[in-house]
């Protein structure tokens, strides 16, 4: 899998993953949390959100099983599952899930270190 394009807006997310932490944004005004990263709160419009580490555990909201690779680099990994996961600390993340996956399953984060970046994956909670 190829490395993501990391810019100044997404760097705190990727830095958190490199440290094996899931980081969401939290509004300084309404205190709601969200992902993906945005420059202002999607709920009240306030700017300058805080970065907040969360456990990363959550519940599968939806998922899809890919039987065709999105790129040649992933051709030997099909089939694989990508899920929308509602995080316990707030926010929703899209990530690969290893093993069994079903709507409503509790999942826990796993961090896969590559040469220059860290990938967030999930597996079913024991």
Sequence positions of predicted segments:
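A broadly conserved sequence feature marking short terminus-proximal activation segments
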Residues: 1-22, 115-120, 126
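Residues immediately within or flanking Cys/His clusters that coordinate Zn2+
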Residues: 21-24, 38
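Short, cysteine/histidine-rich loop/knuckle motifs that typically chelate Zn2+
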Residues: 26-29, 40-46
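Short functional micro-motifs and their immediate structural scaffolds
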Residues: 35, 46-50
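Conserved hydrophobic positions within beta-strands
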Residues: 58-61, 97
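Short, conserved beta-turn/loop elements at beta-strand boundaries and strand-helix junctions
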Residues: 63-68, 114
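Short, basic/aromatic beta-hairpin or loop at an interaction surface
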Residues: 76-92
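Well-ordered alpha/beta subsegment
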Residues: 90-126
């Amino acid at each position: 899998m190829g490395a993501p394009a990391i810019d100044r807006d997404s760097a705190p997310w990727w830095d958190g993953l490199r440290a094996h932490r899931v980081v969401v944004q939290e509004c300084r005004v309404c205190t709601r949390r969200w992902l993906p990263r945005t420059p202002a709160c999607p709920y009240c419009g306030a700017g300058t959100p805080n970065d907040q580490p969360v456990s990363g555990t959550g519940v599968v909201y939806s998922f899809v099983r890919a039987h065709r690779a999105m790129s040649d680099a992933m051709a030997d990994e099909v089939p694989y599952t990508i899920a929308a996961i509602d995080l316990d600390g707030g926010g929703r993340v899209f990530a690969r899930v290893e093993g069994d996956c079903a709507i409503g399953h509790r999942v826990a984060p796993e961090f896969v270190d590559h040469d220059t970046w860290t990938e967030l994956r999930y597996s079913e909670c024991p």
